Amino acid sequence: MVRATGSVASRARRKRILKQAKGFWGDRKGHFRQSRSSVMRAMAFNYMHRKDRKGDFRSLWISRLNVASRIHGLSYSRLINGLKQAGINLNRKMLSEMAIHDPQGFALVAAQAKLALEASIQG
């Protein structure tokens, strides 16, 4: 009979997978074979959604900016265009935070964008 070796490493590997499967339901929690496939699937979703989160936040900031800019008589796209023409380099996250926490400051920025747009139309 062949001598079994590597029991410490095998146990550690199985233990690591079962630890990651904590909170899963049914056999997926305690049986190694099912836990392994469930953990791999969960990790794949985790990877995907970490990438998706960036776009989700960008969409949120754009939605907030659209609402805030319409209060000042601009659409979102015209606001961004006006900011570029005015040479104001604030990213969407900072503009969104400004619109929420510093409405007066955002009003000044929107006014600058509006002036830059009007100047480009006239000249």
UniProtKB/Swiss-Prot annotation:
It comes from the Bacteria. The keyword Transcription regulation does not apply. GO terms for molecular function: rRNA binding; structural constituent of ribosome. Keywords: Ribonucleoprotein, Ribosomal protein, RNA-binding, rRNA-binding. InterPro entries: Ribosomal_bL20, RIBOSOMAL_L20_CS, Ribosomal_protein_bL20_C. Gene3D superfamilies: 6.10.160.10, Ribosomal protein L20 (1.10.1900.20). GO terms for cellular component: ribonucleoprotein complex; ribosome. GO terms for biological process: ribosomal large subunit assembly; translation. Belongs to the bacterial ribosomal protein bL20 family. NCBIfam families: rplT_bact. Binds directly to 23S ribosomal RNA and is necessary for the in vitro assembly process of the 50S ribosomal subunit. It is not involved in the protein synthesizing functions of that subunit. This is Large ribosomal subunit protein bL20. It comes from Chlamydia muridarum (strain MoPn / Nigg). The lineage of its organism: Bacteria, Pseudomonadati, Chlamydiota, Chlamydiia, Chlamydiales. The gene is rplT.
